[in-house]
From Swiss-Prot:
Membrane topology, from the record: Multi-pass membrane protein
Keywords: Cell membrane, Membrane, Transmembrane, Transmembrane helix, Transport
InterPro entries for the chain: MMPL_dom, Mycobact_MmpL, SSD
Gene designation: mmpL11
Membrane-spanning intervals of the chain: 13-33, 156-173, 188-208, 235-255, 279-299, 311-331, 373-393, 530-550, 560-580, 598-618, 649-669, 671-691
Superkingdom as given in the UniProt entry: Bacteria
Gene3D superfamilies per the UniProt record, alphabetical: Multidrug efflux transporter AcrB transmembrane domain (1.20.1640.10)
Homology family: Belongs to the resistance-nodulation-cell division (RND) (TC 2.A.6) family. MmpL subfamily.
Protein name, entry field: Probable transport protein MmpL11
Annotated segments matching region Disordered: 783-802
Pfam families: MMPL
Principal location class: membrane
GO cellular component: plasma membrane
Places the protein is found: Cell membrane
Length: 1014
């Protein structure tokens, strides 16, 4: 992955060009879809319904031709003339379409104003795509959206019905639903991403990848639909999973990139490290999702295979975009993606820091593993219990609201012809034992008559038409019109009865029952019989992928088991929401059965999606375990550091699914609800409760892997794909500091002063700085006292922070900042006043308790350094009679790694002490003593003494005399007499007390220097 990342960075403009070349034609294809998406595809290979369907197409052209119907439905004020004109209009429209003809219906009464009238149509070979013809007919009759067409006077409504019309209406509805869902999804996703990253540039990367994934996949789906059957529901599936997965995958990589930058890596190294960890996890996760979706092919029906194909394309494009476009984008816009907006206070915590809340939570559940596991398991089992009541069904018609024109048209046709006339049960009778005999021969007519009489005895059968014989006279066809709708459960019962009873009729006949009802029945039976096999296949795929990623038998088995619980809970939610109608008031349709396409899709998709979080979390835990060898510590660390990323990704996914659940048709809503519940359960009860508790219970068994299996598995290691960070002498902002908001004034001033320092000290050298953050802790000093000439405050070291000399724990008292001149008197204020970090946490804290940001501290250091260097130049130029303090060595600076990957040169803490001491020697002002006293508050007199006793190595005035500078500094610090101290300043008791404090602190440094010299 690192080599791939390196190539992608180097040739990023080629990557952008390639995706642009794929995006442009995809946009065209997505906007001008060919209309070949179908509402069918439910045929089952080898089933009776498919056999009957094929025989009708081959041997019964009048019965098996694909047809549509136009319906004229009168209003209560319509007349005979209105109906005649409407029917004439429909026939005139039909005549305008080549290859479309009317099928006479002798049983239908002439047009009347008290009942609808239907015009049945037949399409020849010139119109192979029925939905295209249906779209044109809908336009001709004036159908707009879900509103029916009307005649000129509005007294007769016009409809287009049939399989092609259903497909066209579903396609139109899908476009509308996708637009509505994205109107909800995109703002929600943007808000979540802004909350996570605190940067519009960072939030734009995953969002752009999501949109790109959906558009490219839509174009591919349109190309595939030209060569194979693709369901109209593919568009919703692609949009739903494409944007969710693309945003999630790029989110994982971008979060790791920011984390690596904050650990001290350069931007290019951070991109490679992110790809070697999160990028590899994305590849494994995407492959797991794709492998899980291939399980749907086991069902072997065109509708489900097409939806699986669309989902696989969406996952593949999302994965490909994430691992190619993301590193290219980060190499180009990485710095902008890392910078946090100063207006976004909610996202100030770093991605890689451990959350105190989640650390405590994991500790609590691991301390009570049996209670926690029992409670979580009980909740999941309760949610899964309704699965036993799940009823499977299938209906295109119920995908529309009751007010939709397609349902009104079907209802009008049922009123004109009868509810079962639109989908008769078709019984095909063959005589395989006597292939040379004609089906219409007298010896077989008696058997056919007996079968027809038996059909009339079936429940819900209104009439059975006389037998029709095939063109080759080898079979006979009987059509039964039912008294119920073909999609009604009663119609299914009738089909089941016929399949059981008709073969028992005496004779040598072979009976196959087909028709629309039998077709759906066969589809549902195939799903019910094949889903257990699919479950085993998907679970095995997930187990193998987890085994490769985690290299643990127990963790892989546990991951599969936990995902099964999530899927069961999702199935239970389907029953509660749709079958039982618990959320009907929120707009979810109350239906009698769950669409049979939903359970296998949800099973494959949720299994794959859950692997995202499983792999991401467990690889974090394993990485920590390999470092420490302690399971509980590894679990606490893994959960607390990844909880924010997992929660953010889950929120995005749930938002997408919920958006489609509310905006989509019932079938899409079912998928959205089930996936949203599965993800919500997975990231709460499973990842945050069951995973830590079970790992705490099994301790070292979590990591058991037989040696033979370890040798057999491919080597995919997440913890050693790239070299460790070599910081050398670079200062890296700690995560808890780098995540805080930098005061804008301090940031601008530091950058300005850094450039000025580079000009004043071009020969500066870089060294390590153990005092880089000394003075950034909480300020416990008084901030309301003003010195007679320079102000300072008492400081107390925070014992929790440790010694100031420790570079990692030296976040102690606050550093004093710049002073101001007011009415001729020097006044100094603590940096806390007006310069401290103000975020949502510290805003409610007293000024004296707020932490000091490093940039505020470094601004003070820069001020001292610039002041000293400018004073040195001024003394040499304007005061040749003063002592000539020569600099003996270059100015010492330190490299600071910023969160953006940029590096900044700052004066070291020791150099700042030397420079302020130089100012005391050459200028001897109140301000200089006050600044030194306040620096001593932060670093302790002993630490200052260690630095200042070596002052003669950096400055010299009397070359023959050794330690002259340090000796003179001790004299001045032991009894300060600044040149700008006046008698008027002693009149104020507060000023006098402040000056005594400064003298005392300076004296403590002088004493410490004498002790150090011994």
């Amino acid at each position: 992955m690192m080599r791939l990342s390196s190539y992608l960075r180097r040739f990023r403009w080629l990557v952008f060009t390639g995706w642009l070349l794929a995006l442009v034609p995809a946009i065209y294809l997505a906007m001008t879809q060919s209309g070949k998406l179908t509402g069918g595809g439910f045929e089952v290979a080898g089933s009776q319904s498919l056999l009957v369907h094929d025989q009708l197409q081959e041997q019964y052209p009048d019965q098996g031709a694909v047809s549509l119907a136009l319906v004229a439905a009168p209003r209560s004020d319509a007349s005979y003339q209105d109906m005649n004109d409407a029917v004439a209009l429909l026939r005139r429209i039909v005549s305008e379409f080549p290859g479309v003809s009317e099928v006479p219906n002798p049983t239908q009464l002439p047009p009347r104003p008290d009942r609808p009238y239907g015009v049945s149509l037949r399409l020849d070979d010139r119109n192979s795509v029925t939905s295209d013809v249906a779209k044109q007919l809908r336009t001709k009759v004036g159908i707009k959206g879900d509103q029916a067409g009307r005649t000129a006077n509005g007294k007769v409504r016009l409809y287009v019905i049939g399989q092609g019309a259903l497909s066209a209406a579903v396609a139109a509805n899908s476009k509308h639903d996708i637009a509505e869902a994205e109107r909800w999804n995109l703002p929600i996703i943007l808000i979540v991403l802004l909350a996570v990253f605190g940067s519009l540039a960072a939030a734009a990367v995953p969002l752009a990848l999501g949109v790109c994934t959906v558009v490219v996949t839509m174009g591919l789906v349109d190309l595939v639909s030209m060569h194979t059957i693709m369901s109209v529901f593919v568009t919703s599936t692609v949009s739903m999973f494409g944007i969710a997965l693309a945003v999630d995958y790029s989110l994982f990589i971008l979060m790791r990139f920011r984390e690596e930058l904050r650990s001290g890596r350069q931007p290019q190294e951070a991109v490679d490290a992110a790809m070697a960890t999160s990028g590899l996890a994305v590849v494994l996760s995407g492959m797991t999702v794709i492998a899980s979706l291939t399980g749907i092919y086991l069902i072997n029906t065109a509708a489900l295979k097409s939806m699986a194909t669309g989902a696989i394309l969406a996952v593949a494009i999302a994965m490909l975009a994430s691992i190619t476009l993301t590193p290219a984008a980060l190499a180009t816009f990485g710095r902008a993606a890392v910078k946090r907006s100063v207006l976004m206070h909610w996202s100030q915590r770093s991605e890689c820091t451990q959350s105190l809340f989640w650390t405590r939570w994991v500790g609590w559940v691991m301390h009570r593993p049996w209670i926690s596991a029992s409670a979580a398991s009980t909740i999941l089992i309760i949610m899964a219990t309704p699965v036993t009541s799940m009823m499977l069904g299938n209906s295109l018609l119920r995908q529309f609201n009751s007010s939709h024109e397609i349902r009104a048209g079907v209802a009008a046709a049922a009123q004109a012809l009868g509810p079962g006339a639109l989908g008769p049960v078709q019984v095909l009778i063959t005589f395989p034992d006597d292939p040379n005999t004609q089906a219409s021969s007298p010896k077989h007519r008696q058997t056919i008559g007996a079968i027809r009489n038996r059909m009339l005895q079936a429940k819900n059968v209104m009439s059975v038409a006389p037998p029709q014989f095939a063109d080759n006279n080898c079979s006979a066809l009987l059509g039964a019109v039912l008294s119920v709708d073909p999609e009604d459960l009663g119609a299914r019962e009738t089909v089941d009865w016929m399949r059981t009873e008709l073969p028992k009729v005496p004779g040598a006949a072979h009976v196959n029952v087909g028709g629309p009802t039998a077709l759906i029945n066969d589809f549902d039976d195939r799903v019910a019989k094949t889903e257990p096999l699919m479950l085993v296949f998907v679970a095995l795929i997930a187990f193998v992928m987890l085994l490769i990623s985690i290299r643990s038998v127990f963790l892989a088995f546990k991951g599969v088991l936990m995902t099964l619980l999530s899927v069961a809970a999702a199935y239970g939610s389907l029953v509660m929401v749709f079958q039982w109608g618990w959320l009907e008031n929120l707009g979810f349709t109350h239906i009698n059965s769950i669409d049979s396409t939903v359970p296998p899709l949800v099973l494959a998709m949720t299994f794959g999606l859950s692997m995202d979080y499983e792999i991401f979390l467990l690889t974090r835990i394993r990485e920590r375990f390999l470092q420490t060898g302690h399971t509980r510590d590894a679990v606490a660390y893994g959960v607390s550091t990844s909880a924010r990323t997992i929660t953010s990704a889950a929120l995005i996914m749930i938002a997408v699914f919920v958006g489609f659940a509310f905006a989509g048709m019932p079938l899409v809503a079912e998928i959205g609800v089930a996936c949203a519940v599965a993800i919500a359960v997975d990231v709460t009860a499973v990842r945050l409760v069951l995973v830590p508790t079970l790992m705490a219970m099994f301790a070292q068994w979590n990591w058991w892997l037989p040696r033979w299996l370890s040798r057999a598995l491919p080597a995919v290691d997440f913890d050693k794909p790239f070299p460790p960070v070599d910081l050398n002498e670079i200062v890296v902002l700690p995560a808890d500091i780098s995540a805080t908001k930098v005061p804008c004034g301090d940031l601008r001033m530091v950058l300005k002063l850094a450039a000025k320092l580079k000009n004043l000290a071009p020969d500066a050298i870089c060294v390590a700085d153990p005092l880089a953050f000394t003075g950034c802790g909480r300020n416990n000093k008084r901030s309301d006292r003003v010195l007679p000439g320079a102000a300072t405050q008492e400081s107390e070291e925070d014992p929790a922070m440790g010694k100031a000399s420790d570079s990692t724990a030296a976040l102690t008292a606050a550093q004093v900042g710049p002073v101001t001149r007011t009415n001729g008197h020097w006044t100094a204020r603590n940096l806390v006043i007006g310069l401290t970090h103000r975020n949502s946490i510290t805003r409610v804290m007293p000024w004296s308790d707020r932490p000091v940001h490093p940039f505020t501290l470094w601004r003070s250091r820069f001020s001292v350094a610039i002041d000293a260097l400018e004073a040195h130049i001024a003394v040499q130029a304007d005061a040749p009679d003063q002592p000539n303090y020569q600099r003996c060595s270059p100015v010492e600076t330190a490299h600071v790694q910023l969160p953006t990957g940029d590096r900044l040169l700052i004066p070291t803490g020791a150099e700042t002490l030397r420079l302020v001491s130089y100012l005391i020697m050459c200028r001897n002002s109140i301000r200089d003593y006050a600044e030194l006293a306040d620096m001593v508050d932060a670093i302790e007199p002993e630490t200052a003494a260690v630095v200042l006793t070596e002052l003669d190595r950096y400055y010299s005035c009397q070359l023959p005399m050794r330690q002259w500078m340090a000796t003179q500094l001790v004299r001045r610090l032991s009894d300060p007499h600044p040149v700008d101290l006046t008698e008027d300043q002693w009149s104020d008791p507060d000023n006098k007390a402040e000056w005594q404090d400064v003298r005392q602190r300076c004296l403590s440094v002088a004493v410490a220097m004498l002790e150090e010299a011994r």
